[in-house]
Amino acid sequence: MKKIGIGLLTLPLAATTFATTPIPDVSPASEGQHVFINIPQQRLFIYTDGQLTKAYPVAVGKSMTQTTLGEHKIGVKAFNPTWHIPLSIQKERGDGVKSVPPGPKNPLGPVFVRLGDPKLGLGIHGTNTPASVPGIRSHGCVRMKSPDALEFATTITTGSPAYVIYQMASLNEDANKNLWLAAYRDPYNKKNLNTDALRKSIAAWAKANGKNINSKRIDAILKARTGTANCLTCAKGAKLTMPLKSLAWTNGSSVYSKPKFMPKPVPVQNDVLPAGSEIEVNADDFVPDKAASATFVPSNTPASDTQNHSRKPAGSTYTTTPIPENSEPTEVLF
């Protein structure tokens, strides 16, 4: 097998929909698919032809095992992967086990999608511990709830660009021309939040739209960093209305973030490994409870994905059932 709460009007972030999730200041490609993963926000975004189409909660690398920032590409996909345990973790375990087959004990969940150069050892994958998502707790991989991981894997195309970014704030205008600010904690201690640029962007927007914004409200949001979206201009009881537009605040601008013109990408066939292929990445060996083990069924490779270039062995079949929610642990071990 091949290895590979401060007195402000706030809006809680949605778990699985982009409808109420603050969006980052990014310039996605005008053509094709584009993935952005914002570490402080613990969210993954998919843009299609310059428009946001999906957003998911994710768990990312811990401060000691950080998810590599920068530009990557979506690589090979493996459904029902076998986890090939790295030598370092084999030594820690000391039980002679070298791999974990597909199933409820497999920390990769039902699917693994390579992220970037294989030498980085990174991937976007499911989990046997759904309670660990979102969070800052992986060995560097991007972890999704398994149903989300399956949807992601069948949506994204091999070769699509994927950027891991580090934005500690989101500044969005809603459909009612209200301005919303969210601030996030600094898990990697980057200390890269440019508050001067952020305040400049807010001030420029307020002037252009004839709004008054209380600077103390901004101060409170930036100090608390709750990760919730806070309205800077709303009357009491106002609700966020769609669609959202991100301001290009990282440059201190009041204009909207815009897609970056790119030529239409050359179609690339999805590269799908045979079911059960070994994947060697740093993951953690968490064993779910017996109920989860009894009800787990492997995932399938969707027949509707006509662009798949599958290396699936002849005669192999797949079935699908998500990992049950009752497998969530009370303590995350990775």
What do the PLM-derived regions correspond to, one by one?
Residues 1-4:
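Positively charged n-region of N-terminal signal peptides that target proteins for export
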Residues 21-132, 151-154, 160, 179-279:
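Gly/Pro-biased beta-strand-loop elements
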Residues 170-177:
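Short, Lys/Arg- and Gly-enriched loop/turn segments at beta-strand edges
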Residues 7-16:
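Bacterial N-terminal signal peptides
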Residues 138-155:
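Short beta-strand-centered segments at strand-helix junctions
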Residues 274-334:
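Long, low-complexity, intrinsically disordered segments
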